[in-house]
């Protein structure tokens, strides 16, 4: 286990360089996450005869990607970053990929912010193209967990969002402290397990919007559990009742998922 525990010592976050531009493993995993999510969405759109063309789906994913990046970055600035006021007075710096003249990419993304950006982009796209909003949301619910796996692996390879101190033999050393590889826990629980459960639910789907409602509930539960192993966000720590910001937001997501499930099941059955 010694090699595994010291993997960060022996691993370079930069995969390769092109003309002096460093390409990080995180960036590669991010692209893989998008491609996998798109491929899974196309597969189920055809398999389930959803009436969504490949061209329409490609266009939709462009909208979603823009919404996700904007939402994730702005969400991080508003929720987690210690320099929120500075960014609000220097908004052009929010997406600045350079630091001291060196290209470092866009650092600091919030999943919950990404969700908001995704929802806004999806609503705008469906409104503009006269598409069924809930049908698209269900398609995303079944495809996103697959891409999410690669996203969290990217966090692990980028040596960020690491876990709390531990004594378990599979822990990894971060700055001399043995910690939970919580990014991999999240990839497994929030990605793989959520996907498997949604596949089972999908077999008995009764109405459009059911999958996105259950995804919201399942992700919130998985994230809440994983937060017990993840180091609280720097500068924020535990927010209330011994819970991290991620757990507080997950509770809100869980309640939203319950409301959405009740609303769609009892009020919007014919969507």
From Swiss-Prot:
The name under which this protein is listed is Phosphatidylglycerol--prolipoprotein diacylglyceryl transferase
Q: In which pathway does it act?
A: Protein modification; lipoprotein biosynthesis (diacylglyceryl transfer)
UniProt-annotated binding residues for a 1,2-diacyl-sn-glycero-3-phospho-(1'-sn-glycerol): 152
**What role does it play?**
Catalyzes the transfer of the diacylglyceryl group from phosphatidylglycerol to the sulfhydryl group of the N-terminal cysteine of a prolipoprotein, the first step in the formation of mature lipoproteins.
Location in the cell reads: Cell inner membrane
**Membrane-traversing stretches:** 18-38, 60-80, 103-123, 137-157, 181-201, 209-229, 236-256
Per the record's keyword annotation, is Transcription regulation included, yes or no? no
Keywords from the UniProt entry: Cell inner membrane, Cell membrane, Membrane, Transferase, Transmembrane, Transmembrane helix
| EC category | transferase
Protein's membrane topology = Multi-pass membrane protein
């Amino acid at each position: 286990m010694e090699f595994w525990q010291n993997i960060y010592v022996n691993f370079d976050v930069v995969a390769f360089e092109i003309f002096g531009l460093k390409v990080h493993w995180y960036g590669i995993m991010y692209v893989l996450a998008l491609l996998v999510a798109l491929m899974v969405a196309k597969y189920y759109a055809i398999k389930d005869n959803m009436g969504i063309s490949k061209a329409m789906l490609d266009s939709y994913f462009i909208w979603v990607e823009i919404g996700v990046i904007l939402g994730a970055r702005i969400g991080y600035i508003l929720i987690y970053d210690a320099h929120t006021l500075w960014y609000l007075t220097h908004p052009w710096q929010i997406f600045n990929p350079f630091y001291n003249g060196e290209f470092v990419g866009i650092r600091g993304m919030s999943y919950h912010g990404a969700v908001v950006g995704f929802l806004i982009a999806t609503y705008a796209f469906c409104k503009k193209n006269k598409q069924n909003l809930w049908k698209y949301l269900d398609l995303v619910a079944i495809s996103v967990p697959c891409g999410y796996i690669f996203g969290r692996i990217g966090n692990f390879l980028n040596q960020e969002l690491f876990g709390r101190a531990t004594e378990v033999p599979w822990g990894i050393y971060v700055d001399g402290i043995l910690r939970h590889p919580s990014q991999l826990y999240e990839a497994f629980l929030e990605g793989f397990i959520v996907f498997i459960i949604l596949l089972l639910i999908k077999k008995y789907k009764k109405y459009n919007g059911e999958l996105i409602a259950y995804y919201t509930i399942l992700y919130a539960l998985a994230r809440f559990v994983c937060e017990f192993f993840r180091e609280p966000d720097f500068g924020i720590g535990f927010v209330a009742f011994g819970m991290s910001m991620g757990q507080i937001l997950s509770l809100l997501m869980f309640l939203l998922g319950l409301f959405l499930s009740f609303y769609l099941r009892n009020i919007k059955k014919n969507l």
